[in-house]
């Protein structure tokens, strides 16, 4: 399968590496037209306000709001997928959750943890950098996959997966593989 990484900011190369390690083709997505060529899209971390501004500038918001393309958001990508953000309206509003930005602290408060992620594994390496957390799940359709210190850090809803951390900054590509082999594959199979 062809999996795109939105290449406007963030660790694009690292995500592409994880896609390839998962046995699939990674595509650096810089133009809206490329969305037609891929089976799923990863929204990488970075700075969420900048990411939203760039998505508006290049026409990605409208295209993705109207799409059922499977998407995987990491850190800032999770914020972009959220229905609501504490203190402001959500952006793509694909995951029926409320997120709080930078809830684990500033850059100096970054940390690594080993997570038990439902349906994937109980020893997933996770890097948290100015990470958000999911304050609230607003629908029974949202499945909580993992928590850290009682804060929700990974969820799945339909075609969408969101995590607070940066799986691409480790050598552990199992979260990306889960997105492709389960969420993207199920969507592709259902569309046939």
UniProtKB/Swiss-Prot annotation:
The keyword Ligase does not apply. Its EC number is 4.3.3.6, 3.5.1.2. InterPro entries: Class_I_gatase-like (IPR029062), PdxT/SNO (IPR002161), PdxT/SNO_CS (IPR021196). L-glutamine binds at residues 46-48, 101, 129-130. GO terms for molecular function: glutaminase activity; pyridoxal 5'-phosphate synthase (glutamine hydrolysing) activity. Pathway: Cofactor biosynthesis; pyridoxal 5'-phosphate biosynthesis. The active site is at residues 75, 166, 168. It catalyses: aldehydo-D-ribose 5-phosphate + D-glyceraldehyde 3-phosphate + L-glutamine = pyridoxal 5'-phosphate + L-glutamate + phosphate + 3 H2O + H(+); L-glutamine + H2O = L-glutamate + NH4(+). Belongs to the glutaminase PdxT/SNO family. This is Pyridoxal 5'-phosphate synthase subunit PdxT.
